[in-house]
């Protein structure tokens, strides 16, 4: 956690961040599973109040500053979506073990629905990684994969899953 060893719930309040309700699974799985001192989340989408924050593939914005009209998502919009998906992952952890049980973020895997030629996946998934740093300080530093894919469920631009270490 942070240098002051503040409880995670206190740090969230300091930052003005409220964890959302756990998103309902869209298929046959559970949001999170605990094995020993690790919690694995299922892939989380950027749902806000039951609605996807954005939809479509991520592509660079044109020189005129506009995305094309084919359901495109800008890298900046996708970065925001990754942050929301990360919050949803934390909500799944909170629902299973309580957010104050989290010792550290171990691994983040981020999937980015990418238009042909888009290779900015690391920058998109930074939306999740930076959130974990804000909340957990050094304990938010983690191993990570940022993977470009052709399609994601429900036409979401990003999906984030995490592995966290919790108190035994």
Task: Specify the residue positions occupied by each region the protein language model found.
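Short, polar/acidic, helix-capping and beta-turn segments at strand->helix junctions
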Residues: 2-168
């Amino acid at each position: 956690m942070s240098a002051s060893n503040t409880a995670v719930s206190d740090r969230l309040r300091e930052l003005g961040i409220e964890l959302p309700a756990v998103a309902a699974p869209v298929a046959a799985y559970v949001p999170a599973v605990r094995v020993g001192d690790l919690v694995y989340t299922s892939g989380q989408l950027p749902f806000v109040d039951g609605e996807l924050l954005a939809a479509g593939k991520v592509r660079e914005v044109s020189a005129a500053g506009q995305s094309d009209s084919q359901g495109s998502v800008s890298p900046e919009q996708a970065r925001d979506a990754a942050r929301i998906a990360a919050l949803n992952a934390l909500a799944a952890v909170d629902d299973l073990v309580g957010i104050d049980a989290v010792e550290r973020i171990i691994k983040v895997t981020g999937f980015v629905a990418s238009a042909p030629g888009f290779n900015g996946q690391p920058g998109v998934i930074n939306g999740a990684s930076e959130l974990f740093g804000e909340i957990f300080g050094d304990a938010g530093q983690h191993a990570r994969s940022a993977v470009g894919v052709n399609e994601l469920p429900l036409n979401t631009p990003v999906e984030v899953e995490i592995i966290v270490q919790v108190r035994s």
